[in-house]
Amino acid sequence: MGDPAPARSLDDIDLSALRDPAGIFELVEVVGNGTYGQVYKGRHVKTGQLAAIKVMDVTEDEEEEIKQEINMLKKYSHHRNIATYYGAFIKKSPPGNDDQLWLVMEFCGAGSVTDLVKNTKGNALKEDCIAYICREILRGLAHLHAHKVIHRDIKGQNVLLTENAEVKLVDFGVSAQLDRTVGRRNTFIGTPYWMAPEVIACDENPDATYDYRSDIWSLGITAIEMAEGAPPLCDMHPMRALFLIPRNPPPRLKSKKWSKKFTDFIDTCLIKTYLSRPPTEQLLKFPFIRDQPTERQVRIQLKDHIDRSRKKRGEKEETEYEYSGSEEEDDSHGEEGEPSSIMNVPGESTLRREFLRLQQENKSNSEALKQQQQLQQQQQRDPEAHIKHLLHQRQRRIEEQKEERRRVEEQQRREREQRKLQEKEQQRRLEDMQALRREEERRQAEREQEYKRKQLEEQRQSERLQRQLQQEHAYLKSLQQQQQQQQLQKQQQQQQQILPGDRKPLYHYGRGINPADKPAWAREVEERARMNKQQNSPLAKAKPSSAGPEPPISQASPSPPGPLSQTPPMQRPVEPQEGPHKSLVAHRVPLKPYAAPVPRSQSLQDQPTRNLAAFPASHDPDPAAVPTPTATPSARGAVIRQNSDPTSEGPGPSPNPPSWVRPDNEAPPKVPQRTSSIATALNTSGAGGSRPAQAVRASNPDLRRSDPGWERSDSVLPASHGHLPQAGSLERNRNRVGASTKLDSSPVLSPGNKAKPEDHRSRPGRPASYKRAIGEDFVLLKERTLDEAPKPPKKAMDYSSSSEEVESSEEEEEEGDGEPSEGSRDTPGGRSDGDTDSVSTMVVHDVEEISGTQPSYGGGTMVVQRTPEEERSLLLADSNGYTNLPDVVQPSHSPTENSKGQSPPTKDGGSDYQSRGLVKAPGKSSFTMFVDLGIYQPGGSGDTIPITALVGGEGGRLDQLQFDVRKGSVVNVNPTNTRAHSETPEIRKYKKRFNSEILCAALWGVNLLVGTENGLMLLDRSGQGKVYGLIGRRRFQQMDVLEGLNLLITISGKRNKLRVYYLSWLRNKILHNDPEVEKKQGWTTVGDMEGCGHYRVVKYERIKFLVIALKNSVEVYAWAPKPYHKFMAFKSFADLPHRPLLVDLTVEEGQRLKVIYGSSAGFHAVDVDSGNSYDIYIPVHIQSQITPHAIIFLPNTDGMEMLLCYEDEGVYVNTYGRIIKDVVLQWGEMPTSVAYICSNQIMGWGEKAIEIRSVETGHLDGVFMHKRAQRLKFLCERNDKVFFASVRSGGSSQVYFMTLNRNCIMNW
């Protein structure tokens, strides 16, 4: 059978010159559907030989591709392992229709390898058959590769078998892109499960290349298909598989039954780097291919197998007479199987049916004939009976007709009634719909009117606030000018007034100071403070105060005039947490000129009560300046600490700042106090008439994107050198802290280090109100008399604060691992710094079996690194007396005194850790850690960084204070250096298993609020690890605690509404001690929004923004203080081009607000002022949708630069979409969660490992490998504690937490 088309070159082929197939080939039946047409079983008319005929419509666009395919088939199909090309024909069509091209090729009657595998028991071929088929495929590929042709589509469906078990390749070369023999193309790349990684990379990146060795990878996947019934990843969506193939390790055989030769062959074929993959010639010499039984035996075995499978298929198909292809042919044609080579003549099935029909008709005709003959015989025998019979039949027919007519009329009547009922029902529905529509329109009009009214009201409110801001900004400018004019004069007055011999460490302004010597602004502030004190302060009413003047800022402790005079004239303190009896330090920071001050009504009148934390005047070289033991009792025992609110602006405290003391008979201005359990716990009686300062820190885990150097430079300073025999250690502490803080990010106001205005926070400048620029430069110490009794705690409702200054109080930081109770945690000894965790190292070890009285680092003990001086002032935990309640809801008691002045040794507390619900995560069995220990080295000398404690003159009194130790707990104070044991992070988990999946969590004080699929619970981390159910049958997707606002913000419920719960209401659900709170509604919604996907709380200055991602819009709300006390709409951006999945807000250079959001396409920005939306970064190399993980703003960039994390990558860009670093962060695997933690690092949780990386460079700092794959999810973090959850099969979850080494946090 010759080739009907002449052997011409590609350019010379003329499709119109091809012959018509009529009389040469005829079509028998369809065996498959292709994209461009159908594949038929055909037959040569003269010889009866079978052929596969692909019928395609010829269009002008595809004519060149068809010519190229014909040329390829003619050139390279003459090989024993490639289906032979017989010829091409053109079947002419009427004008206006496309002609049909018939491509005639060798017919492989046994079907494809995929068919064979599917019809095999167990869906797996024997190893001998697999080796034989692989060898034949390799021979065909060797032929193609020798002619520089890449098949590009090796898979089971393109490897066909003949009746004699010969193996033939089909659909190679250009045809792989043009069509699929016996199957249609699903996507532009076909099914990707057999594709090599380099081919996929070439689809993603046009610059990538690949060669003929991509066919070797496809051969390896086909071998797995023959062994296991399907290729790897076949249960996934094709686009998902396309994404995973280049990223996953090479697939392997699942079963262990296969020989080593076979597994080695597959491993060799599936080498991911195609340059290392062997060519076909080498694989033909591979033992698995070379060492085979004789070909005859294998082919006989295969033929028997083919025959058996055909018989099975024949039994299934014996009731089917015709076959037609279906659209799902590519999935199901293998099940149907190939028809037998013994052909049914066309029309045979039709003849069979016709024959059966004729037989049936003959049978019925014979029966009718018999009945007619019987009737004639009866008629002849009895004519009268016959007449009667006819009349009877006639009467019966008449009655039947009447009955039929009656039935028809009845049916018509019923149909008419039914139609009437339907019409009435339809009319009623229309009326109901119209009524509903009218009602909805009325409600919509009312809502629109209400919305307009609210908008006008909010607009008027914002205009009033803006006017107040402008007035106070102008007032602040005038104060700055006055201070600049008077600064030199004040310094001269100070030097004249203070003689060297009379210098004291603390300056007391008493009656001897002439008020005329003060600047005008100081007198005005003093006057306002006095008015507030008289009006608001209950202390002022109970105890008359003398009108002692407040000191001006310029009257500081003696310092060299040169360096100090170069300090910017207007400075502001670090934003403190308002509340009663807080120990505050006014760290001054240059105030930017564009700062928008807060309203005067808040900044001048809401002065918080303050206690004094005094600074030494150690910077003066004059020995007379050293304090003497006769220093005022108010100055003793005070603790200096830096407010470590992550949203505050101040740099680290100056080593030598000025200090002022308010006289003990003058009370500061009084404001509504925050009466929480923390505050009441510190109402303790003190010896010497001095009250320990309280340090409470405000924090919000969602807002920790600022430069850590500004927040962590904790300076440890004594109150008085005269009572400080170990003063040298304090100097060492100061040096150590200074060494562990970057000078460029934490400018310290000292004579040797001048403040630089440009060294500002990385987040856009957050200038505070001028209240802090003025009022909080005065650090006040309020003295208490010795006989003053501690105040009892107020009712539970009072524990929650309504202060607008506090974001969330971090009373605990020992995180439940033997930490003090909440009430005592903030006392100076138990906790002198809001970031105690960041300067001490705590390792909680296995809690199961602990020796009795181990004094050193061991299981069940909390080892806190301290210097010997601090040992003296250690305060142990106070038992709160409520053993079954979490600390966040318990009142606190006064500490008891120990006459010996030392903390007595206690029994080992191993059982207590078990009672708290803590177990070892098993850190040495579940997680294998690989950490670069260099990042966890402390930043100072070889000494450990001590916990700041009260020292000095009040140290003896404080040493006598100890707390009732919680039952069984131990705090082991070990002065030896145990850093070597605690350099690496520790992982622990809570024994409690949650029945449903944990979706989110947030720290509420010391305890953890946990949101699951089925409700909200509180995990008591300070007590026995008990779990309290708060809200049931409601899904909680995301949450944040704002303790200062008494709020828990959530996305919850089936409709994903943004709900705000009141913490006082949640607290009362545990205590049940306030009926008034129970009567109130415990939550409210923010707006009428449904379908919230994500939100972010962002604090700028004193404004708290709430940015919310909805289905196709972003809403921005801002917190409005009293009398509104709610989140109010600020901006709305609807009809965004992409659906926001992740959202954040930045303030560029302290001036421009921008919303940054991530979508499935990339990352985008919206300018808040103009509303313009634009793309920041679109990962064009990923053609499928992406999953955005995190938007992280980099430190020291004024909110302009960020790290965008998505999929398993991260890029550094600025807010205008420009790449700023030639670095792409690459995770080791696809993370399920990515989070920025306070140590200036990012963590990624994957199924196989937890990775810790530097946020600045993407450098890998540490890895925790899981012993088994598990799904982990980040929950929240605070200081050096990171909480995450594991989700097991069945939906059960457990809470883990990782304790990072605190020294690494100080070593930025």
From Swiss-Prot:
Annotated Pfam families: CNH (PF00780), Pkinase (PF00069)
Residues covered by region (Mediates interaction with RAP2A): 842-1308
UniProt GO cellular component terms: axon; cytoplasm; dendrite; postsynaptic density
Cited PANTHER family: MISSHAPEN LIKE KINASE 1 (PTHR47096:SF1)
Residue ranges of the region described as Disordered: 299-347, 363-383, 395-862, 881-918
Post-translational modification: Autophosphorylated.
Protein name: Misshapen-like kinase 1
Residues in the signal sequence: none
Biased amino acid composition, Basic and acidic residues: 396-466, 520-530, 702-714, 773-797
Main localization of the protein described in the UniProt heading: cytoplasm
Obligatory cofactor(s): Mg(2+)
Presence of keyword Cytoplasm: yes
Role, per record: Serine/threonine kinase which acts as a negative regulator of Ras-related Rap2-mediated signal transduction to control neuronal structure and AMPA receptor trafficking. Required for normal synaptic density, dendrite complexity, as well as surface AMPA receptor expression in hippocampal neurons. Can activate the JNK and MAPK14/p38 pathways and mediates stimulation of the stress-activated protein kinase MAPK14/p38 MAPK downstream of the Raf/ERK pathway. Phosphorylates TANC1 upon stimulation by RAP2A, MBP and SMAD1.
Main enzyme class: transferase
Complex formation: Interacts with RAP2A and TANC1. Interacts with NCK1.
Recorded catalytic activity of this chain's protein: L-seryl-[protein] + ATP = O-phospho-L-seryl-[protein] + ADP + H(+); L-threonyl-[protein] + ATP = O-phospho-L-threonyl-[protein] + ADP + H(+)
Residue spans of biased composition, Polar residues class: 600-610, 673-685, 891-905
The Protein kinase domain, residue ranges: 25-289
Active-site positions on this chain: D153
Recorded name of the encoding gene: Mink1
Span of domain CNH: 995-1282
Biased composition (Low complexity): 371-380, 479-497, 623-633
Modified residue annotations for Omega-N-methylarginine: R503, R511
Keyword flag tRNA-binding: no
PTM annotation (Phosphoserine): residues: S324, S326, S644, S720, S729, S745, S746, S750
Gene Ontology molecular function, alphabetical: ATP binding; protein serine kinase activity; protein serine/threonine kinase activity
